[in-house]
Curated annotation (Swiss-Prot):
Its main location: cytoplasm. It comes from Caenorhabditis elegans. Part of a complex consisting of a common heterodimeric core enzyme, composed of catalytic subunit let-92 and constant regulatory subunit paa-1, that associates with a variety of regulatory subunits which confer distinct properties to the holoenzyme. Interacts with rsa-1. One of its GO terms (molecular function) is protein phosphatase regulator activity. One of its GO terms (biological process) is embryo development ending in birth or egg hatching. Each HEAT repeat appears to consist of two alpha helices joined by a hydrophilic region, the intrarepeat loop. The repeat units may be arranged laterally to form a rod-like structure. Belongs to the phosphatase 2A regulatory subunit A family. This is Probable serine/threonine-protein phosphatase PP2A regulatory subunit. SUPFAM superfamilies: ARM repeat (SSF48371). Coiled coil: none annotated. Keywords: Cytoplasm, Cytoskeleton, Repeat.
Amino acid sequence: MSVVEEATDDALYPIAVLIDELRNEDVTLRLNSIRKLSTIALALGVERTRNELIQFLTDTIYDEDEVLLVLAEQLGNFTPLVGGPDHVHCLLLPLENLATVEETVVRDKAVESLRKIADKHSSASLEEHFVPMLRRLATGDWFTSRTSACGLFSVVYPRVSPAIKSELKSMFRTLCRDDTPMVRRAAAAKLGEFAKVFEKTAVIEGLHSSLTDLHVDEQDSVRLLTVESAIAFGTLLDKANKKKLIEPILIELFDDKSWRVRYMVAEKLIEIQNVLGEDMDTTHLVNMYTNLLKDPEGEVRCAATQRLQEFALNLPEDKRQNIICNSLLNVAKELVTDGNQLVKSELAGVIMGLAPLIGKEQTVSELLPIYMQLLNDQTPEVRLNIISSLDKVNEVIGAAQLSTSLLPAIVGLAEDGKWRVRLAIVQFMPLLASQLGQEFFDEKLLPLCLNWLTDHVFSIREASTLIMKELTQKFGGQWASTNIVPKMQKLQKDTNYLQRMTCLFCLNTLSEAMTQEQILKEIMPIVKDLVEDDVPNVRFNAAKSLKRIGKNLTPSTLTSEVKPLLEKLGKDSDFDVRYFSEEAKNSLGL
C-alpha cells in the first residue's frame, strides 16, 4: 500500500492526538504515532512536514529502539510527503542520526532507507547533500557511523563526478583498514557490491588491494566475508586477471586456519567452482574440495557434503566419472561412518544423486554398498534421507537389481521404530509397484501395505489409504476386489472404532479408481453396514464417505443407493452425524 493510500484510510484519525502521542511518555503510544507518521505528514502538508515535522523528529531522535526502527523504515518512504525529489535531501539528517545509533537493526534499517532515497536524488543533489553526509559518517568518531557508511558507497558512486569517485574510493579503502574490526567487517561485506558498480577497468586499481588486505585480516569474522567478495571480483575480471589475482586468494581461504572461514568456503563452493572451474586445474580444485570433506570440524564437513552432488554435476563431462569414482567416492565411503550424525544425514540426502552421473555398472559396484550401509544406520534421519533418494537409484539400476539388492532392507524398514521412516517407505510403494510388477508386488510388498492400514500412527494409516488408489489405478479394479476389499471387510468388523474409520478412509480413495459396478458390489455394502455403527464418529465419517463415493456414481444410482442412507443419518441422535449428512446431501444435490 502506498503512503498516500494509507493516509487516506486514516484520514479521520485525529491529527492533534497523533502529534501529542509523539511526545507521550508511554512507548506504546509513541510507537503507534510513529507508525501513523505519514498521516501526520499528509495533514501538515509538504512545507510544514519539511520545516516542522522533520525538524522535530531530528531533534527528538533519542528513543526506544523499537520506535527508532519504525521511524527509520517510515522515513525511507517519505519522499512524496516532503515535496518529491527536489526536497528529499531534508530526510538525510534524521536518517544520518539513526545510522549512528548503537542498536544494529536500527542502523541497518536507516542505511536501507538512505539507499532507497539516494535513488531519488539528482546527481547534483547527491554531490551537494548526500556525499557530505557520507563523508561525515565515514569519518565519524564512533564505529557505528563508519559501519553504516560502508553500505552507502555503491548507491552513490555510479552517479557522481570523477573527482568525487576518486574520493569515495579513497574513503572506502580507509574503512577497509579501520582499527575497529566491526568496521572492517562491514567494509568486507560490501566490498563485492561496491566492486560491481566500478568501471571494469578500475576494479583492480581501485579495490583489489583492499580485498588482499581483508582476506588476511587478523579477525576470522572479517576474512570469512571476503569469500563472497572474492567471488564477486572473479565475475568482474578477465580470465588472466582472475587467474593471477583472485585464484590465489580463494586457494588461501580454502586452507584458512579458522573453521568458520572454511565453512563459508564450503557454503559458497558451487559459486567458487563456477568462477574458477574453467580456468583452474580440475585436480587442484577437487583436492581442495576433498580436504573440506575431510575437515576436522563437523560443520565444515556438513556444508561440504551438502554440495557433493552439485559439485560433481559441474565437473567437466569428460573427467566427471573418473573423478567421482576415484576421488569423491573414496571420501564418501569414509563419511558413511562419520562420528557426526549431521554429516551422515547430509551424505544420505545427496549420495544417490551421483547414480545418473556414473551409470548402472558403477552405481551397483560403488554406490549400492554405501546406500545399504546408510539404509541400516542407527540414526533415523540418515535412514529417512537415504530412502527419499530411492527413485534416483531406481532410474539407474532397474527392477532386477532393485529386487535382489534393496528389497530386503526396504522390507526391514517397513516396520522401523521411527514412524517418519515407515512413512517414507509407504510413499514409495507406488513407485516400487510400477518397477517390480504386480506378481512380485503381491508376493513381497502387498502384506506390508495391508499391515500399515492398522499402524498405531494416524499419518501411516492415512498415507496407506492414499496409496491404495494409486495401486488400484496401476493394477486395476479386479486386483483391488481380490486383494484390498477382503482387508476392508475385516476392518469393518474390527472392535477398535479407529480401524473401522480407516476402512472408510480407504474406501473413499478406492472408489475413485473403481467402476460404478465395483463400487455398488464391493464398497457400498461395507458403507451401509458402518452407517449403523454404534460410534457417532464412525457414522459421521460414513456420511462423509458417501459424499466422496457419491461423486463417482450416476444420478439415478445416487437416488436409489445413497439418498436413503443419508436420510437415515439425517435423523441421527448425534448433531455431528446430522450435520455431515446434510452437507453430503447438499454437495450431491440430493
